Amino acid sequence: MFMKAPVRVAVTGAAGQISYSLLFRIASGDMLGKDQPVILQLLEITPALEALNGVIMELEDCAFPLVAGITGTDDANVAFKDADYALLVGARPRGPGMERKDLLEANAAIFSAQGKAINDNASKGIKVLVVGNPANTNALIAQRNAPDIDPRQFTAMTRLDHNRAMAQLANKLGKTVNDVKKMLIWGNHSSTQYPDLHHCEVDGKVAIDQVEQDWYENDYIPTVQQRGAAIIKARGASSAASAANAAVDHMRSWALGTDEGDWVSMGIYSDGSYGIQEGLIYSFPCTCKNGDWTIVQGLEVNDFSRGKMQATEQELAEERDAVSHLLP
């Protein structure tokens, strides 16, 4: 089988829970294809290097044919050197008594440094996905610190919300997720996100016409918005495997393209489409082709949707303003 030249994939927080589900998927070819060798460049904080070494030992012990090399480091300049893809998974979790503003500031320091390291060391064509929360604003901070990289190359993950929304809808209608097309998450990866069923199709028919409005507004939307919290309550830990799966899905769609007649939700640099402030990292419906994304244009937005879209935009603007003194 013809093998392509290896690509370099940087992953941060590489000894953490999400990465433990993620790295083996990348190494097996789930993300970039079964014909694409990868060199894994794994970043951790110094105290976690020993744990990272254990993960690297396990990756070696899988003897994945597509793995052309693995490095582990606590130096961002080394981790991002010539990287073609970067998955920024590591972030400061919210500790007891921490306000959201404290969390934003703690992460701003991390993502500023990583943005600079990407700018100075990575391939200029790098594709960056931020998974670590607050993902949209962390992506914005990294992007602003990488002036030599096209802002379109920094994205935030709302694919987990997209997948959650598909599963909830399929369950409600007694269908499978294969029957669901054109799911759409607008806005922030937070409890203000807006899962929009007005353009979504199930079995080729508009989804919103197949459900009661009351269920949609008072059951479905809050369930999707608060799914992460529900998993923490049930499992005693945050969603790791499903987050890793969504990261693989996001990157695969971006790198290899979306299916004909369907789209995906991606947190991307707003160009002002749908009246959303330019420069925010906001989730839009996107199609992907040849390694590039395009916002799906011309969707009708009713008053209900507009209100929801503006509420999540407002939250993103507030997050940006809270860290604006730290942005270049």
Swiss-Prot record:
**Residues involved in NAD(+) binding:** G13, A14, A15, G16, Q17, I18, S19, N107, Q114, V131, G132, N133
Cross-referenced InterPro entries: L-lactate/malate_DH, Lactate/malate_DH_C, Lactate/malate_DH_N, Lactate_DH/Glyco_Ohase_4_C, Malate_DH_AS, Malate_DH_type2, NAD(P)-bd_dom_sf
Task: Give GO BP annotations, semicolon-separated.
Answer: malate metabolic process; tricarboxylic acid cycle
Known EC number: 1.1.1.37
Against CDD domains, the record matches this protein to: MDH_chloroplast-like (cd01338)
Residue ranges of coiled coil: none
Q: Which reaction does it catalyse?
A: (S)-malate + NAD(+) = oxaloacetate + NADH + H(+)
Q: SUPFAM superfamilies under this entry?
A: LDH C-terminal domain-like, NAD(P)-binding Rossmann-fold domains
- Please give the Pfam families that the UniProt record associates with this protein: Ldh_1_C, Ldh_1_N
Named from the GO MF annotations, one term is: L-malate dehydrogenase (NAD+) activity
Q: Where does substrate bind?
A: R94, R100, N133, R164
UniProt enzyme class:
oxidoreductase
Give the active-site positions.
H189
**Top-rank taxon:** Bacteria
User: Which keywords fit this entry according to its UniProt record?
Assistant: NAD, Oxidoreductase, Tricarboxylic acid cycle
Function (record text): Catalyzes the reversible oxidation of malate to oxaloacetate.
Q: Would you identify the family this protein belongs to, as annotated?
A: Belongs to the LDH/MDH superfamily. MDH type 2 family.
Q: HAMAP family, alphabetically?
A: Malate_dehydrog_2 (MF_01517)
User: What is the protein name given in its UniProt record?
Assistant: Malate dehydrogenase
Q: Which organism is it from?
A: Alcanivorax borkumensis (strain ATCC 700651 / DSM 11573 / NCIMB 13689 / SK2)
Q: What is the lineage of its organism?
A: Bacteria, Pseudomonadati, Pseudomonadota, Gammaproteobacteria, Oceanospirillales
